[in-house]
Each structure stands twice: as C-alpha cells, then as structure tokens.
Amino acid sequence: MEDLELEGSLKELFETPSLRWIFVGGKGGVGKTTTSCAVAAQLAKTRESVLIISTDPAHNISDAFTQKFSNTPTLVNGFDNLYAMEIDSRYQETFDFKMSNLPSAEAASFSLTSLLPEMLQAVPGIDEALSFAELMQNVQSMKYSVIVFDTAPTGHTLRLLAFPDLLERGLKKLSTFKDKIQSALQMLNAVSGQQIQEQDFAAKIENLKAVTTSVREAFQDPAHTTFVCVCIPEFLSVYETERLVQELAKQKIDCSNIVVNQVLFPVGGVQDEGCRPPASLLASADAETPAPLEELLAPPAARGEKETAQEENARLRQLIRRMQIRLLALEKSYHSRRAMQSRYLQQIQDLYSFDFHVVPIPQQPEEVRGIERLLRFGDLLSSCRPLPILPPAPSSP
C-alpha cells in the first residue's frame, strides 16, 4: 500500500478529548508562545476548562494575551473557561523539594538539596529536576480539562521532559549518603528543636518516587500527553526540531504535530516561476539612481515654478521608473527568501510528512497579539494547506 502524507493541520489534536497535557516547544524566536496561546484559545471552544502555563523565563504569554499574569491561574479576558499562569523566575524556590510535611516551620525551610550539597555534585541537574518534580506534582492536582505548556527554548524543555530519569538516578544515589542523611537530620533537629526521624525523611523520598513514576507514565501515554514542535524554514530551526523529535522518541513521548511558522506563500496565487523578473532587469535596476522620490512627487507648480509638458512627462517617467525599481527590489528579496525557505520546506516534507501532521502557517502581516488575532491564528492551525515548495529549476539543455 502506498504511504500517504498526514493532513497538515492540528484538527486531530483539537478533536482528541483524552489529551490532558500538551507541550509546545522549539527553538527561541519561532513562534512557540503564539502557537501555544492559539492552541489554548482554540481548545477553549470545545473543552470545559483550559489552562496555559508558561515555563519560559521570558514569559511572553502576557504579551500575547495583552494581560498580566502571575504564578497563580488567572482567567483570560474574553473567556469564561481559559486560564493562564506564569511560573516566575523564583520557581526553583517556589517549587523546591521542601520538607513541608515535617513538624515545624524551621524544618519546612530546609530542602533536600540544602541538606545534601554533595548530591548536587554527584548528580548534576538534580536541583532543577527536583523543582520540575514539584511543579508537575502541582500540575497533577489541577482540575482542568487540558493544560497547555508554553515551554522555554529546546535545551530547557528537554531537561524538563527528562527529569523523571534524572530524578530516579538521584534518588538511587541517596542510598550512598545514608551516614550524611543521619548527620543532616541531627543538624536539622538541633536547629528546629524537633525530633525528625529518618522514617519521616524516607516517607518524603517515597512520595517523590511515586510522583516521578506517575509523571513518567503520564508523559509516555499518547492518549494523555503530546508534544507540538514549532519551527521556521531555516537551518538552525530545522536542526533543533530534528534534535527535539529524536529526544522525544528516546523519552517515549508522543509527538505527532510540527507547526512550520512564518512561511512565505506565492503572492496572490501567482506561480513563482511565472513572475520572476529577468536577471538583466534586476541588474539594471540595481545600477540606476533616479532623482529623490520627494522631488518626483512634488510638481514644480507646488513650489511656484513652471513646468513644461516635456518636463512633466520626463518627471512622471522617472517617478514610474522609481516605483518599478522599488517593486523589483522587493520582488528580488521575496524570491530570494522563497527559494531559501523552499529548500528547508522540502527537507521538512521529506523528513516528517508521512509520520507527522506538518502544519505550514503563512507569514503574518502584523504581530499576533490579542484575542482576535490569536483566534485567527488558531483557525490557521485548524485548516489544511500544502507546503509551498518551489518546483525544481529546469535543467540546462
């Protein structure tokens, strides 16, 4: 049976009611936040309650919705079922592994990583993994129909998704610190005036293991969790997308959708090969320097001077020529960028079109901010259009 390309839209994602967690990520500057906000707004049309969480320190969802958000869910203006929150720059303090179930306020101010600094050296990144664990434990307790994660650029996102494995290694490493744990608890007891037993500490560790296991299971359940990659048709973005796709496969996290943003489509439906200006005409346009546009637009009569019919005709010819040169320069830039994008669109099609929903989004004429524009962007995500790949150049005879 012949393989068929998957439909180029997010329609299937929007129509999957079992999805609870949708991560949106990619290289910085490709439109992750616009896409995640548009996805959340689109889901709000059919889901009972939707939450979008920004884990990106840049926190652009406030800019996208033109509304300030904090680290608690806030209703988005214009909706009755869409909420947003931004994990602030202190989230490692906010969500650090506090020993909050221990008996005193002084004890609660201690964290696992402050008690065992050696663990930070033995397992690099364990402090961030502990923060992610606490964050995801909070997320698991939230009663929203679906949660959309606007993630940080690729490297940070990969660390977040890999935290269950890292944390599991860290917890195994704890067994080698038994004597140090006992000493740390003695110090904590001396400071707090309480008697914290080793089994209290062990209970916290077991709870953390349970969180790690449940989050891993949720991450690896394609009916529960999926990842939407966002890229643009340029080298670095396509490279990072492939890196992200490979890592998601390694982590057994579903990824079935790739949004290709900022794509130039043929202008007015005209085929590219039929509207390319001749190279000789472009070269002559580059060489010409007509009179300044201001002079050509202002007739001498406006300055109290006389102009003969011959002078007027010459001025108008120069004005038309000046406009031609400007249009040719724009067209030259357009075709150059179309050709560059087409090469990477071809790569994207070859790599992903049979296993992923590849969704090309046209370059927008204005910044996508505010509910109305985000909803229009969401409609683009829901509709299908082919990748605008240029036909191969005719071979020379």
Swiss-Prot record:
Gene Ontology terms: biological process: tail-anchored membrane protein insertion into ER membrane
Protein name in UniProt: ATPase ASNA1 homolog
The EC number(s) this enzyme carries: 3.6.-.-
Pfam families found in the cross-reference section: ArsA_ATPase
Species this chain originates from: Toxoplasma gondii (strain ATCC 50861 / VEG)
Domain of life: Eukaryota
Subunit text: Homodimer.
Nucleotide-binding among keywords: yes
EC top class named in words: hydrolase
Alphabetized SUPFAM superfamilies for the sequence: P-loop containing nucleoside triphosphate hydrolases (SSF52540)
Localization per Swiss-Prot or TrEMBL: Cytoplasm; Endoplasmic reticulum
MF term (GO), any: ATP hydrolysis activity
Transmembrane segments: none
A cellular-component GO term for this protein: GET complex
